[in-house]
């Protein structure tokens, strides 16, 4: 018996090293620039194994009795890569380079549907500007960023050199700006203060063109632009930055500090900028509307604190302070902004969630002469808002219902004796996201808004469908929009510098818009050859009918009021246009993009010296982004934008193009050096009209940012 056992164990011992032999496979996962991708998932279909790449992009695994194996690598924002690797090669020889997928980069979007949805699955066209793209533009605020990235969008000046937006034929009061889904209080010349929208702690910007009032209510007539805050995933992060620009000796400095302990997540950001007045023309120029760009300084402070008491519940508190001075020749204008809010997000169970929030925003303006407040230009707008949003998932479908209540308070020097006015608005809305087939998605929504001051209500709806018919994705939608009359438009009584009186009209009706949109999209990859990479091409056409537009008309006077201008509703404008966008990036770091917008307006157009839409506009970029070695990364790009001459009977600026060169270098651990030459061709308008590019010619800037936490990795 003992001899038999010995023989059995001997045979097992001889077989063990044979059957137990396994081949070790090693590799490295890199992005298109050569930077390692941490957390990429490597799947081995034959064995069912899955491993993830480490901090340097490295991975290893064992498979018995094989010297070659097929793997599939997946990583958020990149095209899945299936390839064969060998065990007799080292990690460097088994390097796998991932290609960005333009349809999924920063793929989760919320603005178009108010629920998380991948970009490729959103039935409403959404443009996403990622954190990397924001960093490459070196933009200080949303105005700088959008000017470079979006064709058909232009910033100019209105009276008193206040910033004025025109986007696809719509003014600033018809485009809704949000920060994490919350509105901003205050306006000047019908535009929010874009300096409040700094980008120091912004993770991405989502842009939805066309009416979106069925989800967002008033002002979402021409589109929605939503700035979404970063949420740090590292235990701690500290970044410091400073930039100098020669025009106006401009300095911009800031910092961002984040902590993440799992349950607690905090993000604090501070940005301060100062600039001197920039002379555009000499004292003998009598034709230009703008002779100088006023200097000043700006401070932005923001805090966002998140707490997860359980895996299913998240509580968020936020606060912010804004201060800006604009230095004029004989006075200074001061601007203050205060914001705060609380939000709770509860995943009740896997099939339903609830979100409740409160938001407060305040915007004040005042005028100072010799450092003393004159009190003749005092302004304060305060908004309190309550939100509720409930989503129920029904298999692949989703039902969303929500309600909002907002109290709007305004006191301004444009009212009689600086009196105050207020109104309360309330709304309810419902949306159904229907996915009957793998290639078909339909979304329908309806909303009713009520406004107490004008005793008006507005019902809006949206219907959108997406068809995935390979290789094309087709999107089509109808959406209604409205803009309620503001407190200023209803109750204004203002002497405009002795030129004329302007009167409000309490009987104004809400503006209405009807938007129709069709878009075709094609995405894909070139897998082999010199130009291996990914591409995205989309073409869209749209039609907007904008009715009951609120504007001013001549007022003959009355027994108690002198003649002047009064706010009124009038027949609107028809806007037809098309957008074309193409993006391409190779596996070796070369990228190119081109965007074009065509715009045609008809009907009762406002031929204003401040708002003059241009029929043709385009933006383009050619860049190279490469991790050349472990301690050096290079980004170089040349970009530009073009605007045709506006169709106007008034004196206006002509067609122009502006070019920009950007060089960014990442050295060692967390040291980034930026150098920019703006207006590369040194373009200067002969006459600076209100809508001319306010450029002094070619300028340059240099900046440094330090990611302190990377020093210790």
Protein language model annotation of sequence segments:
Residues 435-442, 536, 542-546, 566-646:
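Gram-negative outer-membrane beta-barrel transporters
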Residues 60-62, 182-209:
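Short acidic/polar hinge/loop motifs at secondary-structure boundaries
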Residues 30-32, 40-45, 74-79, 88-135, ...:
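Short, acidic, small-residue-rich periplasmic hinge/interaction motif at the N-terminus
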Residues 264, 355-367, 407, 468-469, ...:
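Membrane-embedded beta-barrel scaffold of Gram-negative outer-membrane proteins
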Residues 62, 126, 143-182:
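Extracytoplasmic beta-strand/coil segments of soluble accessory domains associated
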Residues 295, 308, 432, 479, ...:
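Conserved C-terminal beta-signal and adjacent last beta-strands/turns
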Residues 226, 234-236, 243, 256-335:
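Periplasmic-side early beta-strands and strand-to-turn transitions of outer-membrane beta-barrels
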Residues 92-97, 142-146, 161-166, 178, ...:
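N-terminal periplasmic accessory domains that precede
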